A protein has these predicted regions:
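C-terminal ends of transmembrane helices
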Residues: 48-61, 108-118, 190-192
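Transmembrane alpha-helix boundary signature
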Residues: 78-93
Length: 201
């Protein structure tokens, strides 16, 4: 279970390993696309880890990256088509970003660092753990950005009208991509403040 638990906090792929930052900028202005993106990456990382782990002993080292990319590309295409079929509106919001999962550093990093050296079940848990760790950060950032940027959560108003009547206005800055950087930086700061072993000299 360590492979599942470690990536959630101690070795979070976004805040500790600093991977997958680009999509954190792109899809976190609203909670719904952030959830879908997080779940999509989780499924793809887990399945890709299992597939690569199953065939790891038959992959020539010289072309292993190409094979890993082919596996990931096939899974991303499958997930993209499923989203278009069952969640078209979200698929449109995510647009090219689902396709860019292929180049997500988290996927290639786990395939290369873990799946190529481990059996399918630990690889599956590692994929789920890293995917959920990634999704967790996306969801946290998206919740803050949507509430303060739009006054909604999952497109449902959460700030009472009386607050607006008192003079409050939504913070448009929260909907700009750089705010995701600032929020992730705050999460990293909190993590490192709580865990001294993460601090660099």
């Amino acid at each position: 279970m360590e492979a599942l638990n470690t990536p959630l906090l101690k070795e979070n792929p976004v805040t500790i390993q600093v991977l997958g930052i680009c999509s954190a900028l792109a899809v976190t202005s609203k909670l719904e696309p952030a959830i879908v993106m997080g779940l999509s990456v989780t499924i793809i990382v887990a399945m890709a880890n299992v597939i690569i782990s199953l065939i790891r002993n038959t992959i020539p080292m010289r072309i292993r990256i190409i094979i890993q990319l082919v596996v990931v590309a096939a899974l991303v295409t499958l997930v993209s088509e499923v989203l278009k079929a069952f969640a078209y509106d979200v698929s449109v919001q995510l647009s090219v970003y689902v396709g860019l999962i292929i180049t997500n550093c988290i996927l290639m990093g786990r395939l290369e660092a873990f799946a190529m050296q481990n059996k399918p079940w630990p690889s599956f848990l590692d994929g789920i753990g890293n995917g959920l760790g990634y999704a967790m950060i996306l969801v946290i950032v998206a919740i803050v950005r949507e509430i303060f940027g739009s006054g909604t959560l999952l497109n449902i108003p959460v700030i009472p009208q009386c607050v607006y009547d008192a003079g409050y206005i939504n913070n448009g800055l929260m909907l700009m991509a750089p705010m995701a950087f600032f929020l992730i930086a705050i999460i990293i700061w909190v993590q490192r403040a709580k865990d001294k072993s993460l601090q660099e000299n």
